[in-house]
Amino acid sequence: MSFELTRRQYADLYGPTTGDSIRLADTELFLEIEKDLTVYGEEVVFGGGKVIRDGMGQNGQVTRDEDVPDTVITNAVILDYTGIYKADVAIRDGHIIKIGKAGNPQITDGVDIVIGASTEIIAGERKILTAGGVDTHIHFISPDQVPTALTSGVTTMVGGGTGPAEGTKATTVTPGKWHIQRMLQATEGMPINIGLFGKGHASAVEPLAEQIRAGAIGLKVHEDWGSTTSSIDNSLKVADEYDVQVAIHTDTLNECGFVEDTIRAIGGRVIHTFHTEGAGGGHAPDIIKIAGLPNVLPASTNPTLPYTRNTIEEHLDMLMVCHHLNPDIPEDVAFADSRIRAETIAAEDVLQDLGIFAITSSDSQAMGRVGEVITRTWQVADKMKKQRGVLKDPAGGAHGSEDSDNFRLKRYVAKYTINAAIAQGMADSIGSVEEGKFADLVLWDPAFFGVKPELVLKGGQIAYALMGDANASIPTPQPRTMRPMFAAFGKAVQQSSITFLSQAAIDAGVPEELGLQKVIRAVSGIRSLSKADLKYNDATPDIQVDPETYKVTVDGEDVTCEPADVLPMAQRYFLF
């Protein structure tokens, strides 16, 4: 016998379904559910008098050896580059093993996830599930960045550094074997995935190659160490040999050549460009044009995202501190001024919206904010909708109804998840909500989406969660704050997080030599990449910058936007 529910009643009980829309935080962005893999009337829900009980939604006869999941997230709305849909998500041995319909096949048809006595339940009803964020521009200045990143929904940190040394405060570099191996050991107790960049500055190849064999997953070329054409070429030669990435912060002062010289030195080889607009550093005033090349994987850092009335004013002091400049030296001030251009910053939001810039990252404590990658990405998406309207798929693909924001949502979620993972050769393990991936997942209340997660899972175990007073009689009394959970303690840290290394370092026995206990994965497939491999952000137009006015054009059309006066996902959510 069937029973009819209104959409509101159904959403209250089991979460929204196909055709329903969800507003993301206090933005003007609306997610529309494209499909529902659960079965109407057979939804699994946990609780007193609910479905997931022995002989009902739970099969009491199967053992864990019969591929029963360790955890099922029920009735969650998944927001991912792969789609926007509702499903049950099964996790086993720290990986996503199935996305579909959970329950007990003895009493329900269409079940492809069997809930057993070994299965924990996380209620995903009325929640949004995303992949953990991947931040590819980390200055490892302070260990306190790790919980800050995790509590924002970022589960992977890629970059370089040794602590608050001058080299680290300016450049994402962990220089040399000794520092690389000490940092690998230091991060063993941190419940986050880690990858380190070596220093990409040497006039010979071997000083670079030895860093890759020591455990670096790539090389960083930075102007503060001298972003010369020889450094670029040698780093890329080593990268080609060992299948690792080269990240670059180019030459603001144009001392060693102009952007055209850097492009020639790169020579068509794949490279990951940081803060490609230029305020964070790079050929003045036209580094932004490199984003149109098919071999360049271009990123923004979050200080310039989105463009607001305060963006220009705050940058000068940040830059002076981060790059060890002296405000009493006119040349240092001129250097800083040359990097801060309202015209190129105004173009950056639009280039993100057009899918030309493909990645967002933080530049943590070195002009960027490690806990704001996700928030600022969605602030840009909201600002662009308000200024440019609904974004349509230029390929004509179907992404929900005519006025849905689904295409824009897929483009923007890809920027800090799958595209960042692809750029660093990590996408086989992380970066999306797909079967076979490491279960780094973030569960959001829609009202707090992109601002404050409800749960952060690392390798299938809860690492951080919104939690109330531990002395209270229930979990929810105020103050509710993001607090470390059991995956952040003891030996669980090693089983729930990944240390990424080069294959050469693994072959050389670095994990055994250093006694590394985290899950070890090799980066791979990097040197064959092109921008076409990036999801929803693969545009390669002709970008030009007027050297006098700094006006930016894309295929001959002016590209700019107005600064925002007010942003969503801001003071409404934060006291400080």
Curated annotation (Swiss-Prot):
Q: Which GO terms describe its biological process?
A: urea catabolic process
Kindly tell me the pathway this chain contributes to.
Answer: Nitrogen metabolism; urea degradation; CO(2) and NH(3) from urea (urease route): step 1/1
SUPFAM superfamilies from the entry? Composite domain of metallo-dependent hydrolases (SSF51338), Metallo-dependent hydrolases (SSF51556)
Q: Which cofactor does it need?
A: Ni cation
| Keyword match Cytoplasm | yes
Q: Which residues bind substrate?
A: 222
Q: Where is the active site?
A: 323
Q: Name one GO molecular function term.
A: nickel cation binding
Q: Where does Ni(2+) 1 bind?
A: 137, 139, 220, 363
Urease domain ranges (all copies): 132-576
Cofactor binding note from Swiss-Prot or TrEMBL: Binds 2 nickel ions per subunit.
Q: Which residues are Ni(2+) 2-binding?
A: 220, 249, 275
Compartment list: Cytoplasm
Any idea which UniProt keywords this protein has? Cytoplasm, Hydrolase, Metal-binding, Nickel
User: Which reaction equation describes what this protein catalyses?
Assistant: urea + 2 H2O + H(+) = hydrogencarbonate + 2 NH4(+)
What about PTM?
Carboxylation allows a single lysine to coordinate two nickel ions.
The record's note on quaternary structure and interaction partners says:
Heterotrimer of UreA (gamma), UreB (beta) and UreC (alpha) subunits. Three heterotrimers associate to form the active enzyme.
Full protein name: Urease subunit alpha
Q: What is the species of this protein?
A: Arthrobacter sp. (strain FB24)
